[in-house]
Amino acid sequence: MILELTESCRYLELEQLRDVFSFFAAQGVKMALDDFGTGYASVDTLRTLTPPWIKIDHTFVASIGKNRMDEAIIEYLLQLCHHTNINVCVEGIETQEILSIVQKYRPQLLQGYYFSTPLSTVAFADMYIGKGA
């Protein structure tokens, strides 16, 4: 299980948040910083918390192929996370073109409408577990 802490909410003091991450890790629950890069978190947040996962916000992906700065940010974050053993999910994958560009930076997970629209619990169970689940 992975709990996501959204970037748009104001964090506790980093030391308190590190304790929260440690508590959940001891219970076998992983934490992810969601929408990374658009709110309060910074490289210092990564250094202090060393979260098991970050999810790069879709806004950096939307203009990939047109805006070199956004692609450079994604490349930088993925390189940093690879070197520090932080897993990365890139949000906002909506086309084959975007998928091809992002894949060359080797994120652990990809998320977006290219793969599926959001599903209800019943639709998810039918699709991935089988009818009648």
Positions of predicted regions on the chain:
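EAL-family c-di-GMP phosphodiesterase catalytic domain
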Residues: M1-L14, V29-A133
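Catalytic-core regions built around general acid/base machinery
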Residues: D19-Q27, Y76
